[in-house]
Amino acid sequence: MIQIHALPAFNDNYIWLLQDLSSQQCVVVDPGDAAPVLEWLAQNPHCRLTDILITHHHNDHVGGVVELKQATRARVLGPAAESIPARDVALADHDRLTVLGLEFVVHAVPGHTLGHIAFYHEDAAAPLLFSGDTLFAAGCGRLFEGTPGQMHASLERLAALPDSTLIYCAHEYTLSNLRFAQAVEPDNQDIAERLAQVTLMRSENRISLPSSLALEKRTNPFLRTRETSVKEKADERSGGQNTSQSAVFASLRAWKDKF
């Protein structure tokens, strides 16, 4: 049985730790800081860290890799197209890897960074997606390296996964993302309900993740660029007609950057 733990780091990062209760092995995703992982391992001394999965090269995702590898000898797997410290296995689009007995498929999702990847585990009951800084709950990552067209294509690719997919992103941005989503679609009842729920959760210091792809399709404006209400708001913001979904996305992203 696999349990997934969220280890908070910095102001709003989550390091995801997957624990196999039967084998007493574990894996972490995007350890920007070694300390929370080492603390968890100290509290669970019978569990051995076997693998470190990396989605992209930003320091808040890789800052703890070297220390963790030195402490545990864990294998480091990360995108081939980026410089990842202490990487043992370079991963490219469509590659398959197995950790804790779970097979993951690598999806190249450029936009936030050019070499960004996501890890997808296909499962009839509960598919899993570790999306890094590409797809957030109710939002998406900033475009530090890629183009709006690249990010839109990456999000469309992830949106094609099963609706039941559970989404484990790397930051607690849900509340601010939902406030933006409500500005885009003020009449969207699903957004209003989710905003109320997450406001309560965060007031009680509860995590708002994981999300699901079905929920994102109802409440995430960056996955709703084909909706008339979203396009109309994007056109209003950009002062003209956005003639493609990619252009709608670009308008929304530029707005969100200043929101």
From Swiss-Prot:
Molecular function GO labels: hydroxyacylglutathione hydrolase activity; metal ion binding
Catalysis performed (reactions): an S-(2-hydroxyacyl)glutathione + H2O = a 2-hydroxy carboxylate + glutathione + H(+)
Any one GO BP annotation for this protein: methylglyoxal catabolic process to D-lactate via S-lactoyl-glutathione
Entry keyword annotation includes Phosphoprotein: no
Region annotation (Disordered) ranges: 224-245
Ranges annotated as biased composition (Basic and acidic residues): 224-238
Keyword Cell wall biogenesis/degradation attributed: no
Record's protein name: Hydroxyacylglutathione hydrolase
